[in-house]
């Protein structure tokens, strides 16, 4: 027969094991959520084919008829969670099946909860012919909750473009305001340092892993406007290489998209990137970039797993710049 002391010890050990397993499971779930990709390649190919089909349809039909079809909830261009929206290059919405209130409205400054100007980003993608970007938008299949979305946009002609996207529903999407403010301050500090000390001295400081511009996983990266890597303290082997077409695990060209932001002066963007504290595994990152001058730009980013990023609880915000 077991003594009461042994039985109590057994209960305590079992309880400790349960707590340990629960913590491990939670950590694993968090890591999965911050590193999620569109792991079904057919989803990406389906998205591309869907947008190209809509683009070709728009080129074959007159614009009014095409936009009417794109705005039809029960039409041929609404397939599950895939649907087509369309804008002209001024940012005027010309078609949307789930936001009829958008049609005819100027949405060029439409901003998601983390400061990403999604219509400008999608327009830049389509100006290149076609390309991907990330943004947050309400998911009509999930009670209009704000969710991260990988969008794909394609130019119809010189006047307008069409787009669609795939929701990444499990990823945390809201980066705390304090984290974003600290990110902006860090980048501003780096730009000021570059302006006061010159490009050569600044790049030397930015690439010093033991220097003041590497603070754990918060560090400065820098490129010229051709996509040549100038500062990557955790990836020195990439310095001097052409990274213009570098893609994340979902095919998003994050350097090109960053250049788009820098050409506007500054801006936010999402991408998946190697996390130095996780053996360089890719995970969701919110980046902020600024131009230094007409020749080069710099930026930094915060990882979702390290900034207390959270999931949506409701559709909270899709506003215009200056209204938040």
What kind of region is each of these model predictions?
Residues 2-13:
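Bacterial N-terminal signal peptides that target proteins for export
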Residues 5-6, 22, 320:
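Generic short N-terminal amphipathic or hydrophobic helices
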